[in-house]
Amino acid sequence: MRELIFPEAREVVATRVRVECIPVKVYDQEAKTYIKEQRTDSHGRPLWEVEGVAPVIMDAIFEGGKVQVTEHFEPQRVPIGTHFVVAGDDVTARVYPSRGGLGCTMSGDRLTQPKKSGEQR
C-alpha cells in the first residue's frame, strides 16, 4: 500500500490547550536539512502546520498526524478535545505506511470550529 485518500475526512481534534500555526519549511535533500524557505501548495500559497490538533479519520484519532492549512491564524487557547473542521475547496486526507505504523496528513485552506447543535447560520 502506498497511501489511502479519504476525501470526506475533514475533522480534527485539539490535543493540547494551545493551537497555533508554524511555517512548513522546505527540506533540502542534498544537505539533508530544512532551509529557511517556507513550502507552498500547488497554487503558490504558503503552508502552515497546525500544532496542537490531530486528524480524525473514520472515528480514529491519528496522534502525531499532521494538519496543514494555507490561511494563518493567531494562536488560541481551547479545551483539549475541541473539534474543528478543515475547510476549503481542496481538502485532502491521506493515510500512508510509516515507521512503526501509519502516518496521516490532512490539508486544506483553513481551520474552523463546526457549528454547535441547534446553531443557525
Q: What kind of feature is each model-predicted range?
A:
Residues 1-121:
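OB-fold and OB-like single-stranded nucleic-acid-recognition modules
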